[in-house]
Amino acid sequence: MLRFGRPNVEKLEGKRDVVGLTRVLSSTPQVELRTQALHALTRLGELDLVIGALGDGAAEVRAEAARALGENRDMQAELPLVLALRDHDWHVRSAAAEALGRLGDTEAEEPLLAEFGDSNSHVRAAVAEALGRLGDARAEVPLVRQLCEGDRLVRAKAAEALGQIGDRQAIEPLLAALSDEDAYVRESAARAVGCLRDAKAIDPLLTLLTDPDSSVRAQAAESLGKVGDARALGPLVEALGDRRYDVCRMAARSLARLGWRPGCNEYGARYYLALHMIDRAVEMGGCVVKPLVTVLLEDDSHSMRAAAARALGEIGDERALGPLIACLNNSGVPEVVRMAAAEALGAIGDSSALRPLRTALLDHDPEVRDTAKQALDQINVRLGWPGAAVKSGSR
């Protein structure tokens, strides 16, 4: 088979040709093909052959074999994976540690703990993550040591692992880690104290709601909801006005968890918007325009931005004209948002939108062009100028 050109791994897998795939894995010089054969054998359930690939000459194949064994959770792989912790390549050692965590056998804890002495921080981080998956409280002291002494990646993974283990005795070192110089560590520690649900974390988490890093602020907001203390209500309401929408969303979810009832004001509007309940927000009237504009311009969800645009069109407030026009004529804005902006401008019906809509008749997307034409027709009819849109687009 291999003498007559490049082997077709997909075809071999379709035929369930284990012999052919084994030949590719053992004899083909191309690492990419050996890796493909490895994955095919994994899908076919030939895990003994996958275990054998831990001895492949290429570190990439060995690491992929370790990952595959972890994902399949075959306990026969435990000893070979423990041996792979001594591999000369750190990618393989890291993959083996992750896989042992996925197997879930606490017997692997001792060899994993020994790897905290590994010279590579990625391996030590993988060990911490694996120990968190195993969830054995015996790992707590070594993890606390890594939290206090390791580099940033190891500190972060140690914090997350302590949260997964869930022993409240770890609360003090985790609280200290909330003040870590590194944002990733602060975020991981905030997630961990949320898992522990200890009221001691309330004040430090409230402080993190003003952290310069938005990921830290978002995680603090989420963890405050998990801890479940009413002292967090006021600060979480303030967090609804955060300039980053991921923070707003987490604050809204935590407020819902704490049973907060929104009022008919801008914070209430932001609450509904963050939970993607735009219809409820629109019912509030004029106070919703500013937060809707924020969603239109900043949200990371294209569908959410489009929904905000349509809601602004439904409200019909002229304050939305500038932001809607900016979205319509910006080719970097997703097509679905540009279409919704055109639709909203047509619904508002202000003559200041005529020129931007005519410009949109030249948009590279046909659906945007069609929506712009419909919006122009809508405005022109409203102004008593029927047919003007067609003429403007026929130049």
Please give the residue ranges for each predicted region:
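TPR/Sel1-like alpha-solenoid repeat signature
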Residues: 69, 84, 93, 100, ...
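N-terminal segments that cap or nucleate solenoid repeat domains
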Residues: 1-49, 53, 58-61, 68-69, ...
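Conserved hydrophobic register position within alpha-solenoid helical repeats
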Residues: 5-8, 34-37, 65, 96, ...
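A generic tandem-repeat structural signature
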Residues: 52, 57-72, 78-103, 109-114, ...
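Core register positions within helices of long alpha-helical scaffolds
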Residues: 11, 40-43, 68-71, 99-102, ...
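Short inter-helical turns and helix N-cap capping residues of alpha-solenoid HEAT/ARM repeat scaffolds
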Residues: 29-30, 57-58, 88-89, 119-120, ...
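Amphipathic alpha-helical scaffolding segments comprising HEAT/armadillo-like alpha-solenoid repeats
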Residues: 14-26, 44-55, 74-86, 105-117, ...
